[in-house]
């Protein structure tokens, strides 16, 4: 069941993980935190009409961030989590194009970090 508080909690966890990630360069942290800030607004808006989908997007963002920032990388898990993240916005291309573009940018950024 969707809860706006759960959504905000998930975003806060991602933000904390990024801020404390020792595996990220400062410019990567800055970029991802800016993208996350924008994502927070986008999925908050989406949650008004599609609460569970908004939570899924936040959840896949959290898992993808975890995989991209962990000290011991597991490329296959990162790939799967990023694919899930990209899939989480399918169907919103017309109604929420900026959300789709943003999530795709986050997915690409996280994927590139796992190289």
Say what each PLM segment does:
Residues 1-33:
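Short terminal alpha-helical segments
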Residues 15-18, 22, 39-47, 61-68, ...:
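A structural signal for well-ordered alpha-helices, especially hydrophobic packing surfaces
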Residues 29-34, 54-59, 79, 83, ...:
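Short, charged, amphipathic alpha-helical segments
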Residues 45-63, 75-78:
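Short, charged early-sequence alpha-helical segments and their helix-coil boundaries
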Residues 64, 68-86:
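Strongly charged, low-complexity linkers/loops
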Residues 79-115:
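Amphipathic alpha-helical binding modules
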């Amino acid at each position: 069941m969707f809860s706006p508080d759960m959504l905000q909690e998930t975003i806060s966890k991602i933000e904390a993980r990024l801020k404390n990630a020792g595996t990220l360069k400062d410019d990567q942290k800055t970029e991802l935190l800016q993208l996350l800030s924008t994502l927070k607004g986008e999925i908050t808006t989406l949650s008004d009409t599609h609460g569970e989908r908004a939570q899924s997007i936040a959840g896949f963002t959290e898992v993808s961030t975890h995989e991209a920032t962990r000290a011991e990388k597991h490329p296959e898990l990162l790939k799967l989590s990023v694919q899930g993240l990209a899939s989480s916005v399918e169907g919103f291309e017309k109604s929420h194009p900026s959300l789709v573009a943003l999530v795709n940018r986050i997915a690409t950024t996280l994927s590139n970090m796992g190289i």
